[in-house]
């Protein structure tokens, strides 16, 4: 069994991380889609820290285990495949969006921002791009994003928290 161990999670690419930090440091009304994540207490705590540091409104998905505390003041409600009500309003009023391994991010963005309508910068943290080659097309749509960080949310959130703690001049690579 030792010969079949899982590889370590990839670190976020430096340029993508710097671009994400630049977007988030300027954001006044960020929004976080809290998607898939581990059951780790430290990952849970880091998601809360990120939302609080950014003062970002958050949502979770009905089909996933909780990705953010539903009693937290920054949580505005959970959603399924259709975005509506206060969740949709918060997404549309956001000036930056972070998708933490969200289910079908491409469809979520299309529902919130119809083709031709303006939308904020989107940071996608997910390894889902690996499945966007399947012949059956049952993976959902490829999300059109401004920054793609190909790793698991816990690794990227930790790096974002570290980067947001630094002065803006230290974030440039």
What are these regions (language model features)?
Residues 64-173:
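Glycine-rich, acidic loop regions that bind phosphate or pyrophosphate groups
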Residues 2-3, 10-13, 19-97:
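Anionic-ligand anchoring segments at beta-strand to alpha-helix junctions in alpha/beta enzyme folds, i.e.
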Residues 2-6, 43-47, 113-119, 163:
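Short, mixed-charge, low-aromatic patches
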Residues 6-9, 145:
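Generic anion/oxyanion-binding catalytic loop in active/binding sites
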């Amino acid at each position: 069994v030792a010969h079949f161990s899982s590889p370590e999670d990839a670190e976020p690419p430096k340029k993508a991380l710097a671009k994400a930090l630049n977007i988030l440091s300027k954001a006044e009304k960020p929004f976080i889609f809290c998607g898939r994540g581990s059951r780790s207490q430290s990952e849970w705590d880091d998601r809360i820290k990120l939302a609080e540091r950014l003062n970002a409104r958050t949502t979770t998905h009905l089909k996933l285990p909780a990705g953010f505390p539903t009693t937290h003041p920054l949580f505005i409600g959970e959603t399924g495949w259709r975005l509506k009500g206060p969740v949709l309003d918060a997404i549309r009023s956001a000036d930056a969006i972070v998708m933490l391994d969200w289910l079908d991010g491409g469809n979520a963005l299309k529902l919130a921002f119809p083709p031709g309508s303006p939308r904020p910068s989107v940071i996608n943290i997910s390894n889902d791009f690996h499945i966007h080659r399947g012949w059956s097309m049952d993976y959902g749509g490829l999300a059109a994003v401004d920054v793609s960080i190909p790793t698991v949310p816990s690794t990227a959130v930790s790096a974002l928290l570290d980067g947001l703690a630094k002065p803006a001049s230290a974030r440039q690579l």
